[in-house]
């Protein structure tokens, strides 16, 4: 559904062209310093406007509606709203007849019987990643300064140079995908459970809430399939668990081993592309040529790093609370 987490529980709501999108977060320890300004750096990283991103610009100011008093968390659920002001819903009126390839238009209509808000992708829109970033800001505070969560763009359109990848997309007049890597340092040994609540499965669960994510790998990932066992195994060097290599990506048996947690995600090309495509005309029953109008990202991967950090922090903050490594009352 629309919720994630066991103790640090995140619930997202809203639609792209509705009045607002927002997030409700339960399980936050009391006493964490928190103001509107704390959210701004990460929200700014997610914003549109840079080369290769959508021209749609919103202020993206977080309005804290509950759970904060005297600039500190109270221990009650926190609700944060983001207003939608720069919408152009007329761009989407034609979509009732032409479901966009690669988007949720067709399946959403079938699942919700045509009652869904289709404007701008509705509840399926990447705009709802604002909610994830906001939750991630709080999650990072729970993790504390000793744990760093950092994601970087590694590849655009198959090229390690993002600028070159974007230029290739502009020349082709088409959208492109990318690869983003996240590294978490400072984690204690022992987070995670075997099987269904492993660190990998929990992070993957959160990661796939980000629209456009099509794959994830930890450590050596798919390259491990081409390695020998002695090559892939990480030799343990000392009692702290430090290893000579990190092909496991910081997780063994679903449990953190004290080495950096490393994973990468594949981000598909933006489904809304300037190129003419063909799709079913629901009204006529015929497959017809179709082009997507509106304001869209050329490469959504450019805006994914801060969102990836957020969902990783959400998952790890939940583990920290479950392991009682974070107190219910925050202490500096």
From Swiss-Prot:
Q: Where is the signal peptide?
A: none
**Catalysed reaction, written as an equation:** 5-O-(1-carboxyvinyl)-3-phosphoshikimate = chorismate + phosphate
Record Pfam families: Chorismate_synt
Residues the entry annotates as binding NADP(+): 46
User: Among its keywords, does the record have Iron?
Assistant: no
What UniProt keywords apply to this chain's record, in alphabetical order?
Answer: Amino-acid biosynthesis, Aromatic amino acid biosynthesis, FAD, Flavoprotein, FMN, Lyase, NADP
* Assigned EC number: 4.2.3.5
What cellular component terms from Gene Ontology apply here? cytosol
What is the free-text note on the cofactor?
Answer: Reduced FMN (FMNH(2)).
The protein's required cofactor(s) are namely: FMNH2
* Binding site residues for FMN: 123-125, 253, 268-272, 295
What is one Gene Ontology biological process annotated in the Swiss-Prot or TrEMBL record? amino acid biosynthetic process
MF terms in GO: chorismate synthase activity; FMN binding
CDD domains annotated for this entry? Chorismate_synthase
Listed pathway(s): Metabolic intermediate biosynthesis; chorismate biosynthesis; chorismate from D-erythrose 4-phosphate and phosphoenolpyruvate: step 7/7
Q: Is Lyase among this UniProt entry's keywords?
A: yes
Identify its protein family. Answer: Belongs to the chorismate synthase family.
Q: Its function?
A: This reaction introduces a second double bond into the aromatic ring system.
Describe the subunit structure.
Homotetramer.
**Annotated HAMAP family:** Chorismate_synth
Q: What is this protein called?
A: Chorismate synthase
Q: Highest lineage ranks of the organism?
A: Bacteria, Pseudomonadati, Bacteroidota, Chitinophagia, Chitinophagales
């Amino acid at each position: 559904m629309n919720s994630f987490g066991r103790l640090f529980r995140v619930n997202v709501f809203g639609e792209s062209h509705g009045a607002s999108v927002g997030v409700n977060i339960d399980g936050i320890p009391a006493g964490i310093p928190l103001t509107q300004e704390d959210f701004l750096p990460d929200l700014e990283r997610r914003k549109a406007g840079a080369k290769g991103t959508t021209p749609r610009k919103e202020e993206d100011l977080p309005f804290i509606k509950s759970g904060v008093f005297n600039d500190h968390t109270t221990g009650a659920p926190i609700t944060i709203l983001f207003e939608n002001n720069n919408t152009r819903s007329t761009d989407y009126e034609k979509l009732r007849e032409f479901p966009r390839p690669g988007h949720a238009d067709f399946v959403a209509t079938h699942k919700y019987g045509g009652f869904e808000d289709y404007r701008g992708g509705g509840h399926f829109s990447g705009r709802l990643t604002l909610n994830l970033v906001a939750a991630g800001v709080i999650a990072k505070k729970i993790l504390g300064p000793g744990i760093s969560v950092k994601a970087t763009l590694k590849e655009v359109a198959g090229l390690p140079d993002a600028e070159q990848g974007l230029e290739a997309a502009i020349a082709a007049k088409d959208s492109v995908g990318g690869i983003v890597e996240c590294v978490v340092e400072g984690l204690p040994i022992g987070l995670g459970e075997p099987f269904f609540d492993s660190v990998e499965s929990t992070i993957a669960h959160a990661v796939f809430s980000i629209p456009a994510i099509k794959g994830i790998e930890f450590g050596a990932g798919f390259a491990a399939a081409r390695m020998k066992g002695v090559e892939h195994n990480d030799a343990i060097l000392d009692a702290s668990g430090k290893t000579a290599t990190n092909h496991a990506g910081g997780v063994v048996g679903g449990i953190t081993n004290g080495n950096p947690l490393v994973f990468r995600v594949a981000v598909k090309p933006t489904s809304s592309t300037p190129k003419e495509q063909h799709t079913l005309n629901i009204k006529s029953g015929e497959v017809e040529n179709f082009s997507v109008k509106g304001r869209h990202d050329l490469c959504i991967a450019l805006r994914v790093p801060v969102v990836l950090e957020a969902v990783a922090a959400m998952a790890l903050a939940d583990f920290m609370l479950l392991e009682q490594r974070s107190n219910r009352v925050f202490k500096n």
